[in-house]
Amino acid sequence: MRDLKGIFSALLVSFNEDGTINEKGLRQIIRHNIDKMKVDGLYVGGSTGENFMLSTEEKKEIFRIAKDEAKDQIALIAQVGSVNLKEAVELGKYATELGYDCLSAVTPFYYKFSFPEIKHYYDTIIAETGNNMIVYSIPFLTGVNMGIEQFGELYKNPKVLGVKFTAGDFYLLERLKKAYPNHLIWAGFDEMMLPAASLGVDGAIGSTFNVNGVRARQIFELTKAGKLAEALEIQHVTNDLIEGILANGLYLTIKELLKLEGVDAGYCREPMTSKATEEQLAKAKDLKAKFLS
């Protein structure tokens, strides 16, 4: 099995103004991540890819383009989770056939699913696809808060490799790593890379890595090497950048920063605001000049 540790960009998707997928732009984003950001892999089909506003066929098209462009240069994780289990299975089978290294699935959301229902969801995707699985835990968006015992139940399935941990509960993170040292944890909050790395995470998956991947790796590797003061200085700069991005509109701003690098990052998918305002464009230029030049 391919090594899935390290720095993974949560892949942005370029859309045309009419909302269709901009294949040329998407390929440029992928190449930028591989050639410039030097990431270890891509997490395809997640929140950053505006996934939950897309049709099944559009999701498949993005999986296809990403695999065709990246080939075997880096590791690829396909996020196939959906509140529709049949869609999750269909996407999982498709990504597996394409040769994705691993699947991931967000916990089923909106309805208040019981834990046995959540476990059934993961076990079904795994059984139907035969691929490995990374649980995607993002409780502030899904409302699903799992404890250490529940993760332990999921980990009884040998195909569950670990969790993408997008939560602020670092006590739970530490407890999980101690209780299940052979299961991997990917940090999901870019702004908390240093504390996550100090607690032993195996990698990180982040949206801002599309433009700030080099610093993300520096923070991760310096922290692992015990050089905390150096790592903290880079985390400070990173968080200044992230603060500016968040204040200006997360996905729009990252796309505008990519455009300033010559990447056709396109528009966002409605009902998100699809196009940056002049004020947002000016702020993106300011962020690039301060942090990415």
Swiss-Prot record:
Keywords in alphabetical order: Carbohydrate metabolism, Cytoplasm, Lyase, Schiff base
Assigned GO CC terms: cytosol
Binding site for aceneuramate: 47-48, 166, 188, 190-191, 207
Compartments where located: Cytoplasm
Assigned EC number: 4.1.3.3
First-level EC class: lyase
Main location: cytoplasm
Pfam families in the cross-refs: DHDPS
GO biological process terms held by the UniProt record: carbohydrate metabolic process; N-acetylneuraminate catabolic process
Domain of life assignment: Bacteria
Family: Belongs to the DapA family. NanA subfamily.
Matches recorded under PANTHER family: N-ACETYLNEURAMINATE LYASE
The protein's name: N-acetylneuraminate lyase
Organism: Haemophilus influenzae (strain ATCC 51907 / DSM 11121 / KW20 / Rd)
